[in-house]
Amino acid sequence: MPARKQPRSVAREIALLSLSQIKGKPDKLEAVELDELMLAAVRTLSSEIHDILEDAASEVSRAEEQLLRSETLAVNVKSARTMAADALELTRAAINRLGHVVELPEFLQLTRQHEVRNFALEILTTLRRRNDQIKEVIDGSLVDWQYHRLPRLDRDILRIAVAEILFLETPYKVAINEAVELAKRYSDEDGHRFINGVLRRVSDRLRAEDSLK
C-alpha cells in the first residue's frame, strides 16, 4: 500500500494528468466530478504507456536488424546493444507509469476526497482563466528553450506551479518542491532538475518585481 499523501499533493497529480483530457470553459469545470478527473488521469497514463511501449518495440526491432548484420560489422553489435538498453529503459518507464495507474485510486482512499476534487478543479480553472499570464512568466524564465517546444508534461508541471504561486497563494518553496516531485514521477531522468531551475528563476524574477513595488 502506498504511503499516505496530502490531499493537495494528490490533487496536483490528478490535475496534471487530467489537464489534456478535461475540456470546456472555466465556469463549466465546477460541475466536473472526481471520478471524471480520475478517468481522465488514467486515460492520460494509459496513452503514455502505449506510446512508451511502442517506442520500446521499435528499438527492439532496430536492435534485431543490427544483430542480423553483425556478422561482418562489429560496430553493429555495439549499436544493437545500445538500442536494446534504450528499449529496456523505455520498458521500465512504462512499468513505472503502470504503477502510477494502480496507486492513484489507493491514494484517493487514503485522503479527503472532497479536498482533492476542489483543489484539482481550482488548479484547472486557474490554468484556463490565466493561461496567457502563466505562459508569459514561464517564457520569461526559460534559458535556451522555447515554451511551445517543451515536453507537454514538463510544460504542464511548470504551469501548475506558476498558477499556484501567482493566483492560489501557495508559498514559493511548496510550489517548487511539489513540482519537482511531480517531475521525478512523470518526467525523464533530467526533468526534475530542469523544472527546479526554471522555477527558481521564476521565483527570483517575481520576488525582484515585488521588491520594486
Curated annotation (Swiss-Prot):
One Pfam family of this chain: NusB
MF-aspect GO terms: RNA binding
The UniProt record lists the keyword Lyase: no
Gene Ontology cellular component list: cytosol
UniProt entry tagged with the keyword S-adenosyl-L-methionine: no
SUPFAM superfamilies from the UniProt entry: NusB-like (SSF48013)
Record keywords: RNA-binding, Transcription, Transcription antitermination, Transcription regulation
UniProt-listed InterPro entries: NusB-like_sf, NusB_fam, NusB_RsmB_TIM44
Signal peptide as annotated in the record: none
GO biological-process terms attached to the record: DNA-templated transcription termination; transcription antitermination
Family the UniProt entry places it in: Belongs to the NusB family.
Job of this protein: Involved in transcription antitermination. Required for transcription of ribosomal RNA (rRNA) genes. Binds specifically to the boxA antiterminator sequence of the ribosomal RNA (rrn) operons.
Protein name stated in the entry: Transcription antitermination protein NusB
